[in-house]
Amino acid sequence: MFARLAFGAWPGSPQVAISVRMAQTAKKDMAPPASAPTPMMAQYLALKAAAEDCLLFYRMGDFFELFFDDAKTASACLDIALTARGEHDGQPIPMCGVPAHSAEGYLARLIKAGHRVAIADQTESPAEAKKRAGSKALVGRAIVRVVTAGTLTEEALLDSRAANWLVAVAGAGQGADRRIGIAAADISTGRFEIAGLIPSALDAELARLDAAEIVVPEDFEEPPAGAVAWPREHFESVRGEERLKRLLGVATLDGFGAFTRAELAAAGALIAYLERAGQGSLPFLQPPRRRVVADHMMIDAATRESLEITLSQAGVRKGSLLDAVDRTVTGAGARLLGADLSAPLTDVGAIEARLDLVALFEGDGALRERLRGALRALPDVGRALGRLVARRGSPRDLGQLRDGLDQARLLHELLGRAAPMPALLAGLLPQLVGHDELVDLLRRALVATPPIDAAQGGYIAEGYDPALDALRGQGGEGRKAIAALEARYRAETGIPSLKIKHNGVLGYHIEVQAKHADPLMTADSGFTHRQTLAGVVRFNAPDLHEQAMRVGQSGEHALAAEAAHLEELMAAALGRTAEIAATADALARLDVAAALAERAAEGGWTRPHFEPHSCFDVIGGRHPVVEAAVAAQGARFVANDCRLSDQERLWLVTGPNMGGKSTFLRQNAAIAILAQAGSPVPATSARLGIVDRLFSRVGASDNLARGRSTFMVEMVETAAILAQATERSFVILDEVGRGTSTYDGLAIAWAVVEAVHDINRCRCLFATHYHELTRLAERLDALSLHHVRAREWKGELVLLHELADGPADRSYGIAVAKLAGLSPPVLARARDVLKKLEAGRAATGGLAAGLDDLPLFAAAAQVEEAAPDPLRHEIETIDVDSLSPREALDILYRLKTLAREAAE
């Protein structure tokens, strides 16, 4: 699957047209036959019709409520209680709800389960509604946002160390002229990419992005798994060009590149989708980067999965190549490192620029440690900016900008003295500064640790606004006066437990225990009864009311003043959106370079060197994931060389299972990825020619969803390699042909080796158990034979994991089966069958010769009788009851001697 989450159709598609009609029908059905729905329910039904196939979070006070089928779905998904509110057609209306203050966690679970959620929030307070339409007025509500997997910005809903891509795909042209356009945006950071490609490259590009959500036209042929179908009208290239120009605020797109019709269609659809999700407002998007596919190593979906580049076979980060390499200390750095490994470069100059920066930090351990220490304290500037632009920001986000930009200035001072100065660092340094005015403003305006919730105030620093300070002073004096009133009331009433409390309904009030309430109930007491509860009675008094009014008014005015300042501060920050985004990107690049330097120093990695010809010369190469796993067990990874050249561009590798063939293949593919991503590599030395495309056919499993067996999956992947690999490609093939009959598999493997050698002419490592393939070395000039070494010692197989020249003498399959725990009778039978097969092949040259000599019923095969065991015989002859102590001691010594002789 290309999308991590699968979703249904979007409003406007044929599927949704059906759901809309159903919603309209349901709306009619929900109306009681004898009476209209209540005003609140009528409002809900109208909003639900607008939300269409999304779950509707309907704000009621401090909760988001869901009704009808939405409630049933949410209660099952969230494991919360399903209750009822009112009736419909004589039946209770299902209802469930979640607290508004903790809604993000529930949203995350719903999104992960594949749902989309429309947020219907209150657009006014109850007090404002009363002013507008009287005491029975219904609070206004509107859908303010549609939450989908690709439109998230909240910290609680995102993985801090992974990008969150929303992708739109569009096509243009027919037949050989057909082209695909892709627009991808991570709105949490504003990153925006546009690319054009041929249809056959679509799967590889989607695999690179690993999108959270994919949007395609409703009539798109063979849509990616989990894609959202959207009306074709949103994918018109002319409208797409207009949307893109409006987004960028330009009259022409000439300054951003020559976009194709397909690219404009995809970009326009992406922008329209984001506008729909934001209910008319757009999130933060940087100017689009036009991605040229040829500038990056092409890696298809099957190869990414088999090499476990960013995710392991289990679908998690742990155990992946990224996990083994990652030493970043910021979320932004981790995201950038993942992007680098997912799209290695093909331009030697750009690769060397990255390696130069890594070399600077690797060579200066003190500088590297100071840099990493400073980066550890950095907030996620990019995502804080994304939330602010999307109008989902908080005072804390402004505080993160303040702290992050201030730290960037200090890093500029630290790194500005570096010598020699790498070109990449020289380009990054100017992006770290220029924010002094904004940082100074935020430092003066905000408290040291601003809160997430702006509703309660308290985030504007004292001294920034004298008028605000005066309002706060009035509120403080009022609260002191209320405390004095509490002491006075206690003295006047003689009730020592009397308290003045505050809540959102009654405001400030006097509370006494019920047993003390009667004297306060009298008309001349000076107190007014407000509420009776179990055990307590609540009152008000004129002077308390007067002080409460003063506190309330000053508090309201203070909150309004803080809100106005918050808007001013946000506007100041958003006025530097592009510059702040550039700083965030520069900080991430520094983190990646320092992290790779740390990894290289930690693991003894080396800088790769690039050659103009198609060599692949790696000395002492290692697999970083396997090496880490082996080291954790206290063992040492066995390094191996891989020396491909124009004269030996295809290595045929044989040897036993578990001998290390697959690891050898994968480690060299991993080295190619790391090198072209701009990273040192786990080897003693490495000289490489640029790899334009990387292919891996290692391991396979049934694809039941698409009706493909393991062998069919293997053949589809092999066919793709033979069709797409060029002379600059690097291919690893493991056990091609093993999923069918021996003769068929051997024939296919033979033909594939010939095709790779004669037609594709690419660098290739081919692992096999078909020893017959070694004959190809006699006529294929650029093919050389190699094997992983193994020995048998005292009947046991010893796997050396070393690569040697020449073919393996045998596969040691039965020895490996013994290691796996097959029973002695089965192993004995296997040896008997193997002897007859090998004897037949030696006599006739036929693989199946000798089968006729085997007994008809294999299960009846006789197992060789075990040799006599002297130790066992000695024990069986002992008469325990007749032994004297001295005889027993002599027998023990004799048994010990027999045991030692048996062990030898």
Swiss-Prot record:
This is DNA mismatch repair protein MutS. CDD domains: ABC_MutS1. GO terms for cellular component: cytosol. Belongs to the DNA mismatch repair MutS family. Pfam families: MutS_I, MutS_II, MutS_III, MutS_IV, MutS_V. NCBIfam families: mutS1 (TIGR01070), PRK05399.1 (NF003810). ATP binds at G655, P656, N657, M658, G659, G660, K661, S662. PROSITE patterns: DNA_MISMATCH_REPAIR_2. SMART domains: MUTSac, MUTSd. GO terms for molecular function: ATP binding; ATP-dependent DNA damage sensor activity; damaged DNA binding; mismatched DNA binding. The keyword Protease does not apply. It comes from Rhizorhabdus wittichii (strain DSM 6014 / CCUG 31198 / JCM 15750 / NBRC 105917 / EY 4224 / RW1) (Sphingomonas wittichii). Gene3D superfamilies: 1.10.1420.10, 6.10.140.430, DNA repair protein MutS, domain I, MutS, connector domain, P-loop containing nucleotide triphosphate hydrolases. InterPro entries: DNA_mismatch_repair_MutS, DNA_mismatch_repair_MutS-lik_N, DNA_mismatch_repair_MutS/MSH, DNA_mismatch_repair_MutS_C, DNA_mismatch_repair_MutS_clamp, DNA_mismatch_repair_MutS_core, DNA_mismatch_repair_MutS_N, DNA_mismatch_repair_MutS_sf. The gene is mutS. This protein is involved in the repair of mismatches in DNA. It is possible that it carries out the mismatch recognition step. This protein has a weak ATPase activity. One of its GO terms (biological process) is mismatch repair. The keyword Repeat does not apply. Keywords: ATP-binding, DNA damage, DNA repair, DNA-binding, Nucleotide-binding. It comes from the Bacteria.
